[in-house]
Curated annotation (Swiss-Prot):
EC numbers on record: 2.1.3.-
Name of the molecule in the record: Nodulation protein NolNO
GO molecular function per UniProt: transferase activity
Localization annotation: Cytoplasm
This protein's encoding gene: nolO
Organism of origin: Sinorhizobium fredii (strain NBRC 101917 / NGR234)
Function text: Involved in the O-carbamoylation of nod factors.
Biological-process GO terms, alphabetical: biosynthetic process
Gene3D superfamilies referenced in this protein's UniProt entry, alphabetically: 3.30.420.40, Carbamoyltransferase, C-terminal domain
Amino acid sequence: MLCLGLSGGLSKIHENSLDLPNTFMHDGAAVLVRDGQVIAAVEEERLNRIKHSNKLPRRSIQYCLEYAGVQLSDIDCIAYYATEAFCNAMLERLLVSQSHMSIPLDAKLLLRGLLAQEFGTEVDPSRISFVSHHLSHAWSAFSMSGFEQSLILTIDGGGDFASGLLAVGSGTEVKPLATFPESDSLGLLYLETIKYLGYGMFDEYKVMGLAPYGDPAPHRDLFEQFYELLDNGGYRIYLDRIGPTLLRSIEVRRKGMPFTQQHKDLSASLQEALERIVFHVLRHHSEITGIKRLSLAGGVAHNCTLNGKLLRSGIFQDIFVQPAAHDAGCALGAALMMSNELGQSAPRERLQEVYWGPDLGSDRAVEQELIAWGGHIEIERCDDVASRAAEWIADGAVIGWVQGRSEFGPRALGNRSILADPRPATNKDRINAIVKKREGYRPFAPSVLEEDANEFFELPDSRQEFPFMNFVVPVRESKRNLLGAVTHVDGTARLQTVSRNINQAYWEVINAFRKRTGVPILLNTSFNNNVEPIVDSVADAVTTFLTTDLDGLVVGSYLIKKRTASPEDWSRLALSLPPYSSLHQVRAFTALDRQETVCEIRTGPSSREAVRISSELFELLMRIDGEAPLGDILDLIAPNQNQREALLNELRGLWEQRSVRLHPMRADSAAEPLSSPINL
């Protein structure tokens, strides 16, 4: 029995047509379940390189099929993560707002048509199921919790005209108890508030990280105007009060402005309000049902500060949080739910790992990809990369670490990670500056050997395993100064424990660092810069390595260091436009009362995602059909050396922002000998 779960949008990567509500159609993914067991899963953003991709997850579907060695026609059930009625309503809304469009007002027909175009096969409509959004979330959590019975809470911005679900999971059944309407959305409570802190959608976790710097007391009364706790364990949210009240009460922060103490206090008040509401709901329903286990999913369940406080509260004996709690996890839940309905339920086992994504491939394949980067990198094959990587890190290096299959979900759990020494507090600022290009207050997570976790962190008696970075826990007071780079301002950390049985390669590099330093912990953050998703492939890893100030890179069995590339090395690279980029010439005001024709490259549907480029670069990019050798194009456009250097510098800046791609030519596979041992 093969069930394919899908989340995401209903348009192709180069189309900007289905501009649906921003609380829906994002975080596209595909998950393949065979007889109740997950065999392959990946988020579309990892493959199409669009953060929170709202496109049809074509590449994700293709990966799942190829991994299983099957065709789309072999799939018994395709499960989409929303009800058909909701999808049809969204299409009708779209038609009203964009009457020039020609799309069917039948979501199943639209999905079938897209799958037929992309995979060359007609899908029997009886094999397509539309699954309730919040039931998808619920199944993703409960079916992987290992619990025979638990309360289930799903909370997010919205989906299927609802913002949450409270249910009871028992055996192979999920029975809803209560649904929370979209008007009472906890996700929107957070989103509407952070707009006045200079943030927007998908930035909620940043404000969670800012909250410990503030005091909730100054704005507590203000926030109590925004919600009401009801006697039956319910609540109401008054979203329409948030904007007017905050405009009158605070100094609104714009993006890029410094944070004042008022902004930090507001973040703390918001976090406190969220916690009060969720505790109110769960305490009531735990008492009336007598159930002492909890399964959590939905985007708000990524609030690991809330999760940590719930775990330590004693309301529940145990809590399971779905690692892919956001909408990508709905693809998983939809597939598991339909597999259960078709007679193949998931085993009642606690989820241990989520390394379900694409594999790096064989050593030979990895080596060939690396060699193609020629004069840009030095490569060394090593039989003990863990020891060498630990040596680099102990000597102060910040490195990329890429191994095996990629993780499903938003966390880098040791296979697509940036690693550093967790001890110097300066490492936090350094990584924020050289790689992430983000706010300096943002914390980093520690990865600790599972057997040593209790020595450094205050863990509840009921739980010693925290493999998914879902919970914030206190760092032991005696260890806080030692772990300066991973201890947040309030003395906590977002913990990952690492088991030798689950991820031996990652365990070994942490253990090698322990042997050198006495500390069985590494700083772990996702391997990406501030504009891209987490890297997935070898090419992604090398690109991010070359466009950041990382000191070294480990990919599989290979140690990699940067070379100073010559102009000839750059000329041998291929230049191409990503499918999500487009070129435009527009009339725009460039100075007061002066309008000119300007050139832009856009990475989204509107001019808001536009970067202005020179007319010379515009001409260069317009000449590309697919991909072209950079040197050949420069020869045509810029015979002058100064012009070449200026264009190359402009291209490098766009490459760093992922507006263009620079990469080896596909036919360029001439091998060179590997370098002598690399020292950082």
